[in-house]
Amino acid sequence: MPGLLLLTTTMLLILFALIICFYIKTKTFKMQLQFLSEQNLEINNNNQLLNQEKITYLQKIEQLKCKLEYQERMIKDSEKIREESFASAKAALFDLGKDLSKQLIEIHKMENNTTRELAEKNIETASQKFNTELERLITMVGALNKDIEQSKGTVDLIKQSLLSPIGAGLLSEITLENILKSSGLRPNLDFIMQYSLTTSDSVKLRPDAIIFLPSGNLMVIDSKASKFLVDSQDNSVHLSKTMNYHLKTLTNKDYAENILTNLNKKTQNFNNVITLMFLPTEQAVEKVIAANPEFLQKAWGCNIFPVGPAGLMNMLSFAKFQITDNRRSENYKVIIEEVRKLLSSIGTIADYSKKIGYNLQNMVTNYDKFAASFNRNVMSRVKSIQKLGIDSGNKIIPATLERYQIVSAKSEIIEVDVENQHK
């Protein structure tokens, strides 16, 4: 009995194993059959699509063939129509030429008479217009003479105004103000017009312009003018006396001392003063030198420099350069301070980035350890289960989890030779 039971058990196990093998093979054959059926169905569908495309292309070929035949017929018909129309147009032009020749001969005869009549009328009309324009020109010339007389009076009035001391002074001040405005200097910051001050002797002074230069320097401009500078007549003696008087009054005013005293009271420290005597035109400077060749030397000896518009523009250009350079130096200090703040901010950001780098390194290290443990302990069991015939369905299970490592490297700092770079 025990031997029979063992034999029966063995037979059942063998039978069960055969059934499992048969089941697995049947399952495999079914899957292969299903796969082949799907491929066969896909091939049939592709064949149907290809047949449909073939039919479509054949239809298009037939349509294109019909269109080509139709176009060939149209070309032949158009050539026939063009030949017929050319022949008919040629005949029509021939007939039209005959008619036009006859009409032109008749029109030429009529035009001869009409032209003669029109010429007579045009000559009469032109004569009337000429007489009318001549009368109008005579009237305009009379009115122009009146305007010239009025303009002459206005010019004389302007000349008299300029020849007066007040008019000449205003002209010089206006010229000075226009030059200062066009020089690029900033009003009320780089220069002040008509600066009024009172001396210790209660004497009021008003230089026409004061320009603030860097390093405690001032440029004082006082415009001087005379009617003899504008007058076209030769008045060298009077001009010399007038300009010497202007120089004397300008020296007696002692702008340098009084302006320094006045401005230093306003918590502004100025050390040096340059005084300019401004003349309204370069011709005025030449007249002064011609009237008194020693005038410039005398003025320079008093630390006063006579200049015209060109000389003033040169000095203002130099002054603008100094002011701009000083402003750039002041801004340079501000830039240095801002760069210092920027470097401090960069240091703070570097500390934070260093901490972030450490955190990233720890995260990647921990992930790598997790992936190694997962691949070793979990994925090996998953593979064993899949070998037993249990699939994951539509989900694809990766063979292993990818592992990552962070490589720490120090960046090389490129040092730049500042001196060679500036060279």
Swiss-Prot record:
Family under the similarity heading: Belongs to the RmuC family.
Pfam families in UniProt: RmuC
GO biological process terms held by the UniProt record: DNA recombination
Chain's role: Involved in DNA recombination.
Protein name: DNA recombination protein RmuC homolog
PANTHER family associated with the record: DNA RECOMBINATION PROTEIN RMUC
Residues in coiled coil: 30-81
Alphabetized UniProt keyword annotations: Coiled coil, DNA recombination
